[in-house]
Every structure is written in C-alpha cells, then in structure tokens.
C-alpha cells in the first residue's frame, strides 16, 4: 500500500491510533483509502460529508444533487471498505458517494471570510461571515459523501464507528462536515408550542422568545460538544488536545447559511432521554442532543482534519408529545438544500487555500 500521498504527521497519527492492534487496523485503513482511490479515480478528496438521520432518501435522489451542478463520479458500498460497518438504523444509507462539487465563491474582506451561498441572506456577525444568494461558483472540488453512519447503540465498538472517518482521512480529506438530527433542549412555552415552534427558556438563553424561536428543521452550527456517551475512539495512551475540535473558520462559513450556533451533546442511546435527564442536560448549557457525531469529530481532529458540524432540529425534548424515530426522520429531510449549500461553501473555502492539514 502506497502511503506517499499521506502527510507524514497524519500517517504517524494513524499509526498512533492503531497501536493497540499490532497494525492490523492501520492496514485496513490504508487499504480502504486505496479502494476509494481506485473506484473513484481521485487521488485525494478534499471534503468528507456525513449525512445524519433522515437524509438517506434525499441522497438517493440524484436530481437533488445534480440540480446544483454536482457530478457523481462513483458509488461505493460501505461494505466494500475494510472494517466499516453497514448502518442498520432507519434513515441511514450504506454507501459512500464521490462527487465533483462546484465551489461557492469565498473571499476575505476586512471583516473576515465571506461565502456566497444559495437562497439565503444573513446579517454579518461578529466573525465577519455571511452567506449570500448570488450563486457564484469558482472551480470544482472532489467531495466524499457518506449517506449514513453507524452508532454505538447498534452494538458496535467506538473504533468501528470511526473507521470510515479514518479511511477518509487516509484518502486525503482536509475538511469534514458532520451532520446529525438533534433534539432541541430549549424549553417550549407559549401558544405556538403545539404548532411545532420551540420557544426557549429565556432565563437560560439570555434572549427574548420572539428572537429565538426554533422550528423543526432548523440547523444549528456545532460550536462545541459534551461527550456523555462514555466512549472514546482511542484505546491506550492516545492523549489528544480536544479543547477546540470544532474549527472556528469553517463554522463561521456555515453560520452564514445556518445562523444558530450552540453546544451538542452525545448520548449512547438508543432510548431518548427522560424528563429529568433533559432538565439536567439543559442546565449544563447544552442546546442539542443526539447519539452520534462526537466520536467521529474526535477521530478526525486527531488526524489533522478540520471539522465542522450541523445539527438539524428534529424534535423538542421538553415537549409533552413523545418522540418517535419516524417524526425525527420527517423533520430533517427539509434541511437538505442548506446542507448542500454548506458543502459548496466549504469547497469554496478549500479552493482558496484555507486547508491546514497535517504536513
């Protein structure tokens, strides 16, 4: 297996996270990266996108991708990649797709990075980032899209959960966009709650309800996370600084498309949390809760991949109505156009030389 295309620091990080198994895991990771290169004909992909619950059906609609000029290069079953489990949860696909993606115009002005996106205009924030509706593109970028993911509650080990992330890193990805379906931890209230509007507990949120109403399908940029799963992608003394996993510059680009930002917490699942657990999580300053994403983010960060995330509001944890998986899937499907736009913005940032992978 040729490792010449992998930066030296990343290859060493791969060896480090595989040190407990005598090198077998590393061989599988490198072989998986070779398979991706052979099937796709791409020496190095730039961006990894992982689709969360409910987006599988959209990912099967090729027109949903090609309408914006995306070109599908290849489809690869996850089962063809060594050590990568096939997702069993409803709403998750079992493929990885290779696309050539049009890169949205990204430029640096006096106030920071700006991205032109699709059908959305947002005010410029403190980080100087906005998404605009001009729809201008510059260049094309190779992107890997995983149509689903596996979870701890499927009976898998943490290393199995992150195997695809590690293979993608070995295949060259420098940016990763991780998406998921999350339960909103703001406390609903007011007459709009029954119609699917989440009005936050203003004492906790520090803002007025009128300004901060959440709707099903709203996207939140993940600023930070709390790992309550009791799991780690590492075995042995792999001491990784995770103070700032969620890349500020990538997240700033996303905030022009999805202006909400907050903290995501990962639980093991598969059961949803109790009322007492929900109150405790909210008291910790958590905004959204789910059962994925965090282990992948940690594994990618250790390999020098710049990570950002979007959590789709799929339910309201304080609602008296019971949460069902079917309702979660329905709520997130409408977020696909914004996720697609986010990928194009990240591709644009990558073309402008903002990648900072291990070297």
Where are the regions that the model predicts?
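Metabolite-binding pocket within alpha/beta catalytic cores that recognizes anionic/polar moieties
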Residues: 2-112, 133-240
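Long, intrinsically disordered low-complexity tandem-repeat segments
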Residues: 110-133
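Non-catalytic positions within long, well-ordered alpha-helices that form the structural scaffold/packing
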Residues: 169-170, 282, 301
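Short acidic/polar active-site loop segments enriched in Thr and Asp
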Residues: 174-175, 287, 306
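Metal-dependent peptidase/peptidase-like ectodomains
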Residues: 234-267
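Active-site/ligand-binding-proximal alpha/beta "capping" segment
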Residues: 256-287, 350-351
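Zn-dependent metallopeptidase/amidohydrolase metal-coordination segment
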Residues: 291-328
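His/Asp/Glu-rich mid-to-C-terminal helical/loop segments that flank catalytic regions of hydrolases
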Residues: 317-359
């Amino acid at each position: 297996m040729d490792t010449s295309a992998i930066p030296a620091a990343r290859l060493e990080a791969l060896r480090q996270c595989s040190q407990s198994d005598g090198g077998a895991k590393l061989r599988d990771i490198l072989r998986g990266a070779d398979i991706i290169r052979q099937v796709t004909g791409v020496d190095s992909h730039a961006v990894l996108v992982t689709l969360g619950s409910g987006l599988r059906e959209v990912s099967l609609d090729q027109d949903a991708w090609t309408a914006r000029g995306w070109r599908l290069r290849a489809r690869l079953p996850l089962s063809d990649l060594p050590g990568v489990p096939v997702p069993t949860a409803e709403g998750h696909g079992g493929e990885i797709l290779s696309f050539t993606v049009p890169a949205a115009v990204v430029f640096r002005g006096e106030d920071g990075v700006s991205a032109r996106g699709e059908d959305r205009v947002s005010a410029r924030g403190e980080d100087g980032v906005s998404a605009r509706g001009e729809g201008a593109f510059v260049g094309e970028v190779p992107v890997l899209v995983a149509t689903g993911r596996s979870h701890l509650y499927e009976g898998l080990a943490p290393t199995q959960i992150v195997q695809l992330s590690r293979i993608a890193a070995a295949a060259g990805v420098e940016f990763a966009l991780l998406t998921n379906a999350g339960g909103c931890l703001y406390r609903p209230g007011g007459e709009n709650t029954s119609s699917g509007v989440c009005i936050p507990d203003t004492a906790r949120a520090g803002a007025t309800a009128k300004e901060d109403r959440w709707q099903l399908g709203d996207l939140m940029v993940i600023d930070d996370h709390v790992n309550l799963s009791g799991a780690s992608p590492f075995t042995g003394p792999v001491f990784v600084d995770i103070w700032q996993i969620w890349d500020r510059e990538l997240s700033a680009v996303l905030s022009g498309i999805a202006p909400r930002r907050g903290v995501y917490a990962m639980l093991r699942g598969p059961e949803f949390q109790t009322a007492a657990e929900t109150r405790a999580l909210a008291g910790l300053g958590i905004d959204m809760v789910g059962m994925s994403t965090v282990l992948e983010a940690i594994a990618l960060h250790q390999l020098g991949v710049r990570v950002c995330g979007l959590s789709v509001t799929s339910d309201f944890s304080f609602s008296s109505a019971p949460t069902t998986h079917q309702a979660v899937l329905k709520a997130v499907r409408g977020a696909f156009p914004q996720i697609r736009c986010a990928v194009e913005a990240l591709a644009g940032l990558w073309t402008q030389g903002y990648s900072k992978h291990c070297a």
